[in-house]
Swiss-Prot record:
Belongs to the sugar phosphate cyclases superfamily. Dehydroquinate synthase family. PANTHER family: 3-DEHYDROQUINATE SYNTHASE, 3-DEHYDROQUINATE SYNTHASE, CHLOROPLASTIC. Its cofactor is Co(2+); Zn(2+); NAD(+). GO terms for biological process: amino acid biosynthetic process; aromatic amino acid family biosynthetic process; chorismate biosynthetic process. Binds 1 divalent metal cation per subunit. Can use either Co(2+) or Zn(2+). Pathway: Metabolic intermediate biosynthesis; chorismate biosynthesis; chorismate from D-erythrose 4-phosphate and phosphoenolpyruvate: step 2/7. One of its GO terms (molecular function) is nucleotide binding. Pfam families: DHQ_synthase (PF01761), DHQS_C (PF24621). Transmembrane segments: none annotated. One of its GO terms (cellular component) is cytoplasm. It is an enzyme of class 4 (lyase). This is 3-dehydroquinate synthase. It comes from Cutibacterium acnes (strain DSM 16379 / KPA171202) (Propionibacterium acnes).
Length: 361
């Protein structure tokens, strides 16, 4: 089993490998547990070996991330008389761990949470780093809190029943970690794309562990996204490709998987980086190639740029110019794989041109 340490204020470990979930009972250590999970996973909860627990069912995927689901969760916690000494377990995909984390952050002003992610995306990203949140009509993840888990169990056995689409979507986040910090990930996936998509392979475990190591290092240095300034990049480097991706998800009414939208977002970020940061033509082309090889989309030409641009105004990386009061867009870009920089207030015409290039088939 692989272990990755997340060295934040309260350090915790991410356990990665087959059978990791069997360590949950020991981590709960006799406390009462509220397991937050979708209905499709309820039948697996008895395997945890926890005697005293309550199950809080939530909808699948992004449908879970609503204020209404939170209110129901708080009601269930109250009915179960959950105390500050008890614990919440987030068991599911990234949306489930987001909701479980937010419930833990807000119940009695904060109780412990452990995440047992069941998708590649949740293992590589959502379950690690303490970000929680829900969506509102104005945008994705606009309401939330930072609340770190006390442990994360990435049991690769839980991935074996995932649809291929979910595996591909999650692998997009792993590819992202290759571009922002660890180019070895890109080499491994380029050389072995089929094995990278096989959740039972050692190749998959290697790139997953590398991606988690990247995420752990970034959040350990900048847990609350406070290192980033107008031009500097701290934890926001994890949002490479996300500015466009979140806009696409909103316009697609969340019918696209996050990784699918982020794949297009990374192509856009590469084009923007080519324009402003001197990213080579070769890396721009490689971005398209590696994402295509694992079955992810690299274009989204059915949505007009003007519509996406309006949605970007509520992106969390946007800042207000103190002198003019004008909203300033900021994009995470790369000079080369592993070398990140912030692109601040790019020209509107350049943005449209990069999207056109991104959408060109």
């Amino acid at each position: 089993m692989n272990l990755v340490e997340v060295a934040t204020t309260k350090p915790y470990r991410v356990r990665i490998g087959s059978g990791a979930v069997h360590e949950l009972a020991g981590l709960v250590a006799g406390r009462r547990a509220a397991v937050v999970c979708p209905q499709t996973l309820v039948h697996l909860v008895p395997r945890f070996g926890i005697d005293d627990l309550v199950v809080i069912e939530v909808p699948d995927a992004e449908a879970a991330k609503t204020p209404e689901v939170l209110v129901n969760g708080w009601r269930r916690l109250a009915e179960a008389n959950m105390t500050r000494g008890d614990i919440i377990v987030g068991f599911g995909g990234g949306a489930t761990t987001d909701v479980a984390g937010f419930l833990a952050a807000t119940w009695m002003r904060g109780i412990d949470v452990i995440h047992v992610p069941t998708t590649v995306l949740a293992m590589a990203d959502a379950a690690i780093g303490g970000k929680t949140g829900v969506n509102i009509p104005a945008g994705k993840n606009l309401v939330g809190a930072f609340h770190e888990p006390i442990g994360v169990l990435c049991d690769t056995e839980l991935l074996t029943t995932l649809p291929a689409r979910e595996v591909r979507s999650g692998l997009a986040e792993i590819v992202k970690c290759g571009f922002i910090k660890d180019p070895v990930i890109l080499d491994v996936i380029s050389n072995h794309p089929r094995l990278a998509l096989d959740v039972t392979s050692q190749t998959f475990v290697e790139v997953l562990t590398r991606a988690i190591t990247v995420k752990a290092g970034v959040v350990s240095a900048d847990l609350h996204e406070r290192t980033s300034s107008r031009e500097e990049v701290g934890r926001e480097r994890l949002n490479y490709g996300h500015t466009l991706a979140h806009a696409i998800e909103a316009h697609k009414h969340f019918t696209w998987r996050h990784g699918e939208a982020d794949a297009v977002g990374m192509v856009f970020a590469a084009e923007l980086s080519h324009r402003y940061l001197g990213l080579s033509d070769e890396v721009v082309a490689r971005t398209r190639t590696i994402l295509s090889e694992i079955g992810l989309p690299v274009t989204c030409d059915e949505i007009k740029w003007a519509d996406l641009r309006k949605t970007m105004n509520v992106d969390k990386k946007t800042r207000v110019d103190p002198q003019t009061g004008r909203q300033v867009l900021r994009f995470v870009g790369i000079h080369k794989p592993g070398q990140v920089a912030m692109i601040v207030d790019p020209d509107e015409a350049a943005l449209a041109e990069c999207y056109d290039r991104c959408s060109a088939r």
